[in-house]
Amino acid sequence: LLAKAAAINDIAVREAAAAATSGRPLSDMVNAYRMSMVRQGGTFLGQRGMMFGAGPDGGFVLDNNYAEAKILAKGDVVVFDCCGKYELYHCDLARTGIVEKSSARLTALYTVVREALEAAEAKLKPGANTEDLKTIAAEILTHGGLDLKLTTLAWHNVGLDVVEYAHPSDRTKGWVVEPGMVMNFELFHRDPDIGGVHLEDSIHVTTRGLEYLSTLPRDVIVTGKGN
């Protein structure tokens, strides 16, 4: 069921991206996501189902009427942080997009964020400590010139809740990974000039390796291109 939830979330993100074109309000993107989730038999979390933002304000990932009213312009960076559920099991995925054209600045930032995330994921296995994995990512971000004070690095499990911890202290002190866990590493950098750069996936940890629940590519989404 977690895999099914992730699959319908992938489709909903693609439909949201296709609606994020210049001259349209962010509300069109949000509505496309919500309608897609419901049409596929899932539900979206909260009032809107996705945390989102565009342009410099996107670093805050706003979720309110003011943000929804923003009219997108070509070159706006868009955050997709999309959460929902299917038959009680949750999905949580984050991607970064840009409206209709690429950006050298976004590409540079995103390259560092993706490298940091994937380096930490490469060491994800039973017996690993999440704080050690977080340190791996933090070192790459720092080496790439990104300010850690503007960056969220957070491991969490996902299942019957979208953010699960076995013990409250796991949130701040980390935990030892066990086989069968489905985990997300949320990496979200906030750039004052262009906005948010966000990437996150759900991963099933097994003794044989990692199983990624999403099949959505990790490249920056150039929106409005039939993604």
Regions found by a protein language model. Give the residues of each.
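Active-site neighborhoods and metal-handling regions in enzymes and metal-associated proteins
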Residues: 1-227
